[in-house]
Amino acid sequence: MSEVQGTVEFSVELHKFYNVDLFQRGYYQIRVTLKVSSRIPHRLSASIVGQSESSSLHSACVHESAVHSRVFQILYRNEEVSINDAMLFRVHLLLDGERVEDALSEVEFQLKVDLHFTDSEQQLRDVTGTPMISSRTLGLHFHPRRGLHHQVPVMFDYFHLSVISVAIHAALVALQQPLISFTRPGRGSWLGKGGPDTGPEQPTISLENLVFGAGYCKPTSSEGSFYVPSENCIQHAHKWHRDLCLLLLHAYQGLRLYFLVIMRDIPELPTMELEALAVEETLSQLCSELQMLNNPEKIAEQISKDLAWLASHLMALWTQFLDTVTLHSQVTTYLTQEHHTLRVRRFSEAFFYMEHQKLAVLTFQENLIQTHSQLSLDIRNSEYLTSMPPLPAECLDIDGDWNTLPVIFEDRYVDCPVSGHNLSVYPNFDVPVTSPAIMNLKGKEKNLINQNSSSRKDIPLSTTEAPQLGSDEDVTRRPEVQENVSTWNPIDVCSESQVYLTIGEFQNRAGIPEDECWTGPRPDAVKDSLTDTDICSRSPGPDEGQTPALTYIDVQSSNKYCPRAELVQGINVQHEHRSSRESYGIVKTVPSKVVAGTSQNNSTSLNQTAALELRTLGRGVNQDGKPVLLSLKLTPAEPCDPPSTALREALDTKPSQPDHAEEPEDLSALSGVIKRSASIISDSGIESEPSSVAWSEARSRALELPSDRDVLHQVVRRHAHHRNSLEGGHTESNTSLPSGIQASLSSISSLPFEEEERELALNKLTKSVSAPQISSPEESAEGADTIKNTAGFSEDLDPSSKENSPPRHTSLSYGGSRVQDVRAGHSLADIALDSDRPQGPGYMDIPNDKGNHPELQEPCCLDGMAETPLHVETKGLNLKIPCTIVLENSKSRSFHRAAGETAKGKPEELSMSKCVLSNNSISEVRAASHHRVPEISCSPAVEAVNLNSTGVQNSSLSVNDTMTLNRRHNASLEAKHEAGTVCPTVTHTIASQVSRNQELKTGTSISGSHLNSTEAFTLDSLKAVEVVNLSVSCTATCLPFSSVPKETPARAGLSSKQNPAPITHQPLGSFGVVSTYSSKLEEEVSERMFSFYQAKEKFKKELKIEGFLYSDLSVLASDIPYFPPEEEEENLEDGIHLVVCVHGLDGNSADLRLVKTFIELGLPGGKLDFLMSEKNQTDTFADFDTMTDRLLDEIIQHIQLYNLSISRISFIGHSLGNIIIRSVLTRPRFRYYLNKLHTFLSLSGPHLGTLYNNSTLVSTGLWLMQKLKKSGSLLQLTFRDNADLRKCFLYQLSQKTGLQYFKNVVLVASPQDRYVPFHSARIEMCKTALKDRHTGPVYAEMINNLLGPLVEAKDCTLIRHNVFHALPNTANTLIGRAAHIAVLDSELFLEKFFLVAGLNYFK
């Protein structure tokens, strides 16, 4: 067996130490040790970076391969200490020479981080004498090609609450013959007691034997140079050489690409030139040189030289990288955000939520509880949970795994629930059997040599076979992510489902070979491709010829809750043509699904319009030469329409005679799924854009709280500049995908108080994975000038222009942001100039206008164009048809300039996936993938119809902005046709004839090509989102391919806190977003992530439960990492949020310490003040009245003592403490604060007492304790404080006001908790009470007394959580105590609960 020595280096940085809640003052020290699996022979060395010769007693040092940080002293609460120690661990590994890469990937690396403490200076002198008080072990998931680049805030245990920020960078730096001797792990004696170091040292292998394999015999000196090795030996040498060189080249490329990424994303880093080693070219050169050699010694020597040469380049780059990033604060911030986003996403798995009608809270939902129990068991044993990948650098104690993370079910009781769906958002969605590794998604590295914006590949997921790519193809994809997640406020506005009709269920992404693209003249592909059709036009004007044939597609859905709701009227496909128009084939791409939802609105602005007629769709020509106009009608429906069930109705064509109709054209074939998407009407009366197809209605709502709007206002203020930096100041809108709360900014974008920011903020917002996206000229002067000229250009647009003049295209401008609209009836070259398409490739969108509004920011004098309404609520009618996408020169959008240059015969570069990197600015050319689609069209050139729907309807919409470009567009397009820059394959879409639509149900899709002019626009901090969109069904937040966004870094002058979340560039097999920067290295998606995604989809299909997963939402509760670098100064003028924490029976003030900690960490700068109640900790066995008086006194004294200006008050209670809280609310002295109540978080509270406890053991124990302690509270909990049940304390308490004053009432319960009956903690009926004719009626009255006022309260939302902890088999678990206290001391439960959902209740 040949063996290879591989060298891996780990750079570990200790940044800051945070005293979260340490008990002891004194001297602390961090010690770091790298551990390698003992199964692999290895040698480890450690060193400290930048340490001088002289070192003091307290400075960092190395002791026995462990690095000791400098000693630091902790004296104060919340103290932060900068450690700033950097260390380097070098590991030499002996690897199997036949499978070096696999062997490297399998090595288990662990980083042990220990916290040592002493309060004695004397003890510090003894290195080994300082005791360790806490320890954490990080699993490092290193990949030889990508390395590892991650940052982890390591939190120590409950008794030593503190955090050390650790950054880790790792890379493969060398592969060579074994030059050092390795100690083999000993086999041990027959008793197995042998230690790891008992094995003999392995003798070194000669280079020739290593290179030529075991069958090689070194020739004797007599044979000399006449000896020729066998063919097998030569082949072995060449393969060995090729494999090692390839791995080193990939490692070099992976490190270089990551280096380029962070230089681009972090403006503060110095920009430098990095030497490029093209993988294929360099490898072929090295191999060809080797093949010219025959002498075995020279072959071996050359191989050794090549490996050393590559290793030297790799080491030089690695050194350069470390010099740049080590201890750099901005790099730390970047990695911190990345880790936090991934971690929150991972926690959101196995966290379900479901909505119910408010009245359902009073019903007995036994089936629901049983479903939860069964589902939790199914999940624990499902491949979905067991295949969940780890984080790139993980600590099981604080990150958990499938075996330790809790499963949580949330039930929300709201006025207008979203239900009627099972977890399978797209039930017909097929997860492909082809894994990404099989799909050859490799590309050439050269695309990043000249381009900063890295390529990204989209994995094709379709109902048919996934198209494959050529081995050398790049698929650079426009980012398509839905960040427009509408918040849904059940109080202010009923959940308004939005109609979006999506023709095209998936995004089928693949590429075409580059040789199929051409830049020379191809008149045959171009000559018939231009039609003089309106790109975005309403019904034709009187001066136009009209063919009244109309195809009417009626999409209907059923609604079991609100039958009055009117649904989508249909898609009118009108055929019209002008008198002199030739008949050309129009591309009507009609894939297999129509995803639609009905839309209701109870606001006055919607009712202003009796019907919505969206005819701003593209007109083209069908097979019979009749131009086709797609239009949508929507009549407003009744408010409060709960979602309809998923319907699969074919979009059958029916005759209809609106406007200009004669004969109906047949356009049947669409199997539809009608889905709902909730949205909210903002304060300004403008509705947020619905989630795109990639989002379920559940995903389209981030926060379902009455205070959502307040929360969002707060968030928007906090992230005002953040959004401005989403694009780093360039004019591309969809190149970034925000994470966390930022992902909901689309829905926030219409809030009135941010009008002044809209011009800068809105144009940065990305729309959705496949939905309308917004692009704007932003601050660029050229773009502004272009907009100013809009009126003039629109005048040139004559509806009866010449036959061969290119069609117009239009864009809607929202306060400076532009949505380029439909393009129909023209070839790819026609669209090439208008290539700044925010729209993701493969879809055609229908604008979602709600009616006309007199106010337009820019004049709407477009011929044949209808005015785009302003200040009108938009329902998301997105008709998505796969289409071509191209890039516009977005810096200036100067079509005349491009036209002039092209007319001079300057062909544009047809960029399939190439990016350009300049020293100080980054230009990005996004090339859409090209799909191989069946050429079933009869016309010579099939054009792509691209209907881009409008984005968020903001205060000012101007159709006119992009129309200004039309006249210039015409000239430039003609010039482009002369230049012949057309990719013919792209011009084929899946259908050219309406009559053939039935064949399209398989869902083939067209792709677009991005044509990039030679003068690529350069913009600072331009970049692409690398989110691998598996399909429409794969939400932007799907774990594997999450839209855990990749956003731009803060621009110069903006604080690093506003730095958006980066996408991860992590090794295969670890959890997270798949980075495209490494997409040129190998198959982009790891097998593990891919199988996890498949398992998740399978799980959602198999389990038919009406509910949703939080992981399918784009916005979760936490988007800001712990300890942000720049916390905003608290402005206490608005008052503070007082949070009162009340412990339970026999508890103390420290019981809710972790709860307080995670809220504080999750909401930095949240103006929170915690009162940890301690007045009752000495006697929790007293009666409730006594304890109520104590707590009330404590609260009022706290407010008066600190002279607090209270804006809101929230309560968190555990167990019996919840009863005390409810009792306080009834006291007259507290009446003044009732209007300030915000959230009541009840953790296992016995609100209905301890009646009907199913644990005899616990009931007996409580009875015994009550007797021994003579406890009044326990007596009252068991309803034995009065013979008349209706005079018992708990019954009388239920009759008093209380819960309805809160905005959020959150009840957390667990069936594993036997201390408090499950139904009592949830305040609901139980089966035993129903059968009990004596106590049961009283029990039911209590429930009605408690929940009745809550149901009637408009501003109150009830949320119940059902938690299934992963508990060990212990006595505590058996008696139910473990689950009872897990809500207090389980870091995994608390972090999962708060980071995913719970923090919303305290914002």
Swiss-Prot record:
The keyword Cell inner membrane does not apply. The modification Phosphoserine is found at S775, S776. Signal peptide: none annotated. Keywords: Phosphoprotein. Residues 731-740, 802-814 have a biased composition (Polar residues). InterPro entries: AB_hydrolase_fold (IPR029058), DUF3657 (IPR022122), DUF676_lipase-like (IPR007751), Lipase-like (IPR044294). It comes from the Eukaryota. Residues 445-483, 514-548, 648-669, 718-740, 790-819 are annotated as: Disordered. Pfam families: DUF3657, DUF676. Residues 649-661 have a biased composition (Basic and acidic residues). Belongs to the FAM135 family. This is Protein FAM135B. The gene is Fam135b.
